[in-house]
């Protein structure tokens, strides 16, 4: 059981949310006062047949024969786009030099790990070119501590929530694998006819607009690459652009449309697709770097989630010499897929729709757990 303390107008050094068996103020320290050392990793040897894990800034990157580190450690990504990323480990291992190592003393290591999540190390990152966090910065960070017993209970509580989030993510991944297996099984059955996407649908180009067309509200929503969540519903609620520009009836998104990223500076993003659920209350279309595939056959929605589709995209992008990787409408319309007969297609559509609904409900639940964790981090630390 957790009790809430109204500390809004008090100056006691205690968290807002605390287990009831603990009392007394917390003491403030610098990280350097509660650690044996903070230093960069020194492991350099990769070995294909190494016995020990070699950790980089965001996880295991290989193996090594020379374990240089042991014990409870918190790892912090030191440089690059992932600067500030946290890991917690306890094993014989190697650690590379793009990672800072925190070895606490007389303090619960998990507690420090969760405190740094609460603290948000991104606030320390500096450098316009290559983002960087230094050991000196970490040493000066101030942390308030209760007793070791209280630290342990807070850390254990939050780790249980992390385990629940990990379990939820595993459920989501397993459902996605099940969906993919069903799709591949159906397309490889003997009840299919091979057709081009152009035989059962059409391609619509996105809207071209300029910065002068952008308005704050009461315009047409324009979906871009960042709104496409691969294999999931189109995200038309976050980070959207609204323009004061007329669109054709054909360009207005319709329920069941597939929105495709057709061009991007990153080739890995080209070809990703989302489906539109038809529930946006505003006029809505896609930008010039995206396209719309429209078909009256519901099962085509899942063709864009197959390995065959990904292979088509990969092959279409080979040989390009432009700065921006891109597809064209004909690339989409020429793609060939085995299409099951009407009766099987209807059964598959119902089954796959049910799995999609289950995936979305589990994603929603996982998001709620993550929000709960964010709230607890804000309330259980100072």
Regions flagged by a language model, labelled:
Residues 1, 7, 19, 25-27, ...:
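Amphipathic alpha-helical segments
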Residues 3-5, 31, 125-129, 197, ...:
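Basic chromatin DNA-binding modules
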Residues 11, 15, 94-98, 129-149, ...:
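A short glycine-rich beta-alpha junction/loop motif
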Residues 14-55, 185-207, 334, 339:
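Non-catalytic DNA-recognition/assembly elements of restriction-modification systems
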Residues 17, 29, 58, 119, ...:
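Structural detector for helix-capping/boundary residues
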Residues 27-66, 71-86, 211-244, 279:
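DNA target-recognition patches
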Residues 56-117, 126-129, 134-138, 224-225, ...:
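A short beta-sheet element
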Residues 127, 209, 246-247, 321, ...:
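Short, solvent-exposed loop/turn positions at domain surfaces
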